[in-house]
Amino acid sequence: MSADALSLPFAAPHAAPDEITAVSWNLHKGRSPLGFTAWNAMRNWMQSTHADVYFLQEAMARRMPRPVLAPGFGAQMMDDAVDDVWHCQATEIAHALDWQIALGPNVFKPSWRHGNAILSPHPLDLGGRWDISAHRFERRGLLVARATLAGARPVTLLCAHLALTRAARLRQMHWIAHWIVRNAGDGPLMLAGDFNDWRNDSVALFGEIGLSEVATLLGESGRTFPAFSPALALDKMFVRGLTPLEWRAPSGEAAWLSDHLPYIARLRLDSQ
């Protein structure tokens, strides 16, 4: 799969100094809609976009068994306290490209875990993970970071993955809005992720605290799910202090990498 086939016309590595390209994508634990492992193709796609910030959901980490050495080849040197190795998809690409990363696992199992991640080639300050689980059957979190983007302007970054039921989602939206009002100050802000919000409840709710949804503001459908034939606008990106310029959900080969299409926005940072 070539980078050219998946690249975006506006995701150029040398955009205007005050412009930002942002991507939100539910990685479906690194598997395609047909169940095949697609992580390598996902990684190639992210490399090709040259975005300034990536908001990822369902980024997967698996526990890899500790190495076992055969007798006579140093097995006696193995320490029982040696930890197993965790293979994390988001960390892999961050290390490969020398990007900054913030991780916020939501689901913890003995052999695997998954959750949110924020990646950026720009400096990141980590703000932590906030538990926004509405009930014990769906573990959800709000991942917080701050990046220095577009001429050394700090931008607050929030990555979320909301519940499947409307009642739980509404509670989570109110919690996130409360966090923003209390903790985010007045500077530029981006809130992105898989909101599971085909009813668009979030657009009005976050609009009350001064956030605009990118695709909605541009008059676009915002549909990203299911990837092979998008019918629902489950993924959202809300901004404050940034002007939306363009929205896109790529088609073609990108439709077979995850069950969601990437949500891509080109934004301009408002002048101070």
Regions found by a protein language model. Name each.
Residues 1-11, 124, 146, 174, ...:
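Metal-dependent phosphoester-hydrolase catalytic domains
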Residues 1-96, 103, 108-113, 270-272:
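N-terminal, active-site-proximal structural segment of metallo-dependent hydrolase catalytic domains
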Residues 10-22, 114-116, 120-125, 138-159, ...:
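Beta-strand-turn-beta hairpins that frame and shape the catalytic cleft
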Residues 21-27, 45-81, 119, 145, ...:
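Active-site beta-strand/loop signature of hydrolases that rely on acidic residues for catalysis
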Residues 28-33, 77, 129-134, 159-167:
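Surface-exposed cleft-lining segments at the edges of enzyme active sites
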Residues 96-132:
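Catalytic-core segment of enzymes that process non-peptidic bonds
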Residues 110-111, 135-139, 166-168, 255-257:
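Solvent-exposed loop/turn segments connecting transmembrane beta-strands
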